[in-house]
């Protein structure tokens, strides 16, 4: 879920025992309940805390977290309205006392930041920018007052990293808000926070959170999948993560990293082992992830998690994409009538906020049945089954220009991730030469991948050429995501 990594990082700002921000045993348990999406239990504990310790500010922060998570995970209008209605009241409560605590300004920044991200989710972009700007200012001021405060580093690290991904044509908006930041700067700040937490037994309960932040930046912004995978493997060795299966957000985080690393079997095992519980707020996106992972392995039961997601999720994002995957499933399993039904449903439900859903709608509107060899190769590649993906393309022949373009692109991607870079490069270049004037994403993503190959080889001139080429292309599919990654690449190699 491309938006979730950006949204969920806001969850992982924890609390400690300080003045009016007392993270006592009751609040720690409420926080754990919240992390595990046991919202009712967490809310009940916070009601009790307000009666026992009326000066403690922690309940207002945890209550806002709960409302925020409902908005992000459930995407329902009523929850969004509830979050907005309570924003000013909670800010007033947090500003009453505790001025000498680093949590005083930080907690207010979190309220604004969560409000801003929720507004983005519901397309209120102007108000979102105002909220995020206010959060940024509060974090900067708090850093001036408390330069060693660990969660300042985490919060600003994420914001600085995200600022560094803004494409050059939108940098004017960043400058107008006087935002500053780069991916290396943000990554460094989050690493500092992680090391500080890892070395202090008193902060050990923050370890999963800071690792989540670090893996988020490493995976999504620094584009270093092996490093992100290595971090997760290290975290899995820690006894602190025996509760992983109890925390859906951690399950999501690890599954996302395994997926990007081509460890699809691990994705399926992790998500299959997770058990939904009636005492937890339902995170239906995990069903979607499981269905996609199973389809990437061409499993015969891949349809069931996708149907579960579509039958229960009341939000709008990834609905069209789920229908597209179901259509592909029935095409692969030779049920043409079911295939047609789900192609039509793509047009009827969902929205176009995320790249995946826009691709699904375009797919349905074109009404062109995909070539089975290309489709299987795409899915198997997404699952990391590179030999099977290559075999699916053996014997592929076509006179269709777009299908041929996808064929060269798929071969480039397969060889690239199969660690056969020199075989991938000519296929990427052929895709760029044949498709840079077409609206499809194949040429742009080929240029992005070449930029990453040359960056890792320390050939920064070539890397800069290909990253810049992405930003010069005019294409429709996955435009926001691919352009952001290209801009992030340029920022990483700036001055090299």
Give the ranges of each region predicted by the language model.
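Solenoid-like repeat scaffolds
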Residues: 20, 47-54, 98-99, 145, ...
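Short coil/linker segments at helix-helix boundaries
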Residues: 21-25, 33-46, 60-234
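Residue-level recognition of tetratricopeptide repeat
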Residues: 31, 65, 72, 110, ...
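Alpha-helical repeat scaffolds
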Residues: 45-47, 79-96, 127-140, 171, ...
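Generic helix N-cap/helix-start motif at coil->alpha-helix transitions
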Residues: 20-26, 101, 149-150, 168, ...
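Residue-level detector of the short coil/turn that links helix A to helix B
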Residues: 37, 123, 222-223, 262, ...
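Alpha-helical adaptor scaffolds
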Residues: 211-215, 219-220, 259-260, 371-384, ...
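Alpha-helical segment of the N-proximal tetratricopeptide repeat
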Residues: 25-39, 371-388
């Amino acid at each position: 879920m491309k938006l979730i990594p950006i949204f969920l990082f806001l969850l992982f700002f924890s609390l400690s025992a300080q003045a009016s921000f007392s993270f006592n045993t009751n609040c720690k348990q409420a926080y754990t309940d919240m992390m595990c999406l046991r919202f009712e239990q967490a809310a009940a504990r916070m009601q009790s805390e307000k009666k026992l310790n009326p000066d403690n500010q922690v309940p207002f922060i945890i209550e806002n977290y709960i409302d925020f998570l409902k908005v992000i995970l459930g995407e329902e209008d009523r929850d969004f309205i509830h979050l907005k209605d309570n924003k000013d009241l909670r800010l007033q409560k947090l500003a009453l006392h505790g001025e000498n605590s680093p949590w005083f300004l930080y907690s207010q920044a979190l309220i604004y930041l969560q409000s801003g991200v929720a507004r983005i989710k519901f397309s209120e972009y102007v108000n979102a920018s105002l909220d995020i700007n206010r959060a940024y200012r509060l974090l900067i001021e708090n850093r001036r007052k408390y330069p060693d405060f660990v969660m300042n580093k985490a919060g600003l690290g994420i914001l600085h990293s995200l600022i560094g991904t803004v494409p050059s044509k939108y940098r004017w908006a960043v400058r107008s808000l006087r935002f500053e930041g780069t991916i290396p700067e943000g990554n460094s700040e989050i690493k500092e926070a992680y090391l500080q937490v890892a070395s202090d037994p008193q902060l050990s309960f923050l370890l999963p959170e800071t690792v989540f932040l670090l893996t988020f930046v490493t995976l999504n912004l620094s584009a270093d999948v092996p490093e992100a995978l290595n971090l997760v493997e290290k975290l899995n060795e820690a006894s602190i993560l025996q509760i992983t299966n109890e925390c859906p957000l951690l399950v999501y985080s690890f599954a996302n990293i395994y997926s990007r690393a081509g460890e699809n079997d691990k994705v399926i095992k992790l998500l299959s082992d997770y058990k939904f519980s009636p005492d937890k707020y339902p995170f239906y996106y995990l069903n979607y992830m499981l269905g996609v992972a199973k389809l990437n392995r061409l499993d015969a039961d891949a349809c069931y998690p996708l149907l579960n997601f579509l039958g229960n999720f009341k939000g709008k994002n990834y609905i069209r994409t789920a229908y597209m995957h179901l259509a592909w499933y029935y095409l692969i399993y030779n049920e043409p009538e079911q295939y047609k039904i789900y192609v039509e449903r793509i047009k009827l439900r969902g929205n176009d906020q995320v790249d995946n859903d826009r691709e699904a709608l375009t797919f349905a509107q074109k009404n062109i049945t995909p070539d089975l060899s290309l489709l299987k190769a795409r899915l198997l590649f997404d699952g990391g089954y590179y030999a099977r993906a290559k075999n699916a393309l053996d014997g592929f022949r076509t006179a269709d220009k777009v299908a041929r373009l996808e064929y060269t692109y798929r071969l480039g991607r397969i060889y690239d991730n199969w660690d056969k870079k020199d075989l991938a490069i000519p296929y990427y270049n052929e895709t760029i030469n044949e498709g840079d004037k077409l609206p499809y994403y194949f040429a742009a993503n080929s240029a992005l991948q070449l930029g990453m190959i040359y960056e890792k080889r320390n050939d920064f001139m070539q890397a800069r050429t290909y990253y810049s080429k992405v930003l010069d292309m005019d294409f429709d599919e996955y435009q926001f995501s691919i352009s952001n990654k290209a801009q992030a690449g340029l920022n990483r190699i700036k001055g090299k």
